[in-house]
Amino acid sequence: MRTTVTVDDALLAKAAELTGVKEKSTLLREGLQTLVRVESARRLAALGGTDPQATAAPRRRTSPR
């Protein structure tokens, strides 16, 4: 999908410098993928411990002798 965006030149230059990626479309795609990954992880972490019915997973190891 083609989209026109206005991006801060300094921000784009800093991202290119840090990543080594010079192509603007690649920088934007990588940035969006990272944003989705970070937000997904944040939401998953926010769910931690919210299932009152959860039980401990069974362990496969036998007890040490």
From Swiss-Prot:
It comes from the Bacteria. GO terms for cellular component: extracellular region. Keywords: Secreted, Toxin-antitoxin system. InterPro entries: VapB_antitoxin. Residues 46-65 are annotated as: Disordered. Its main location: secreted. The keyword Secreted applies. It is found in: Secreted. One of its GO terms (biological process) is positive regulation of growth. Antitoxin component of a type II toxin-antitoxin (TA) system. Upon expression in M.smegmatis neutralizes the effect of cognate toxin VapC32. This is Antitoxin VapB32.
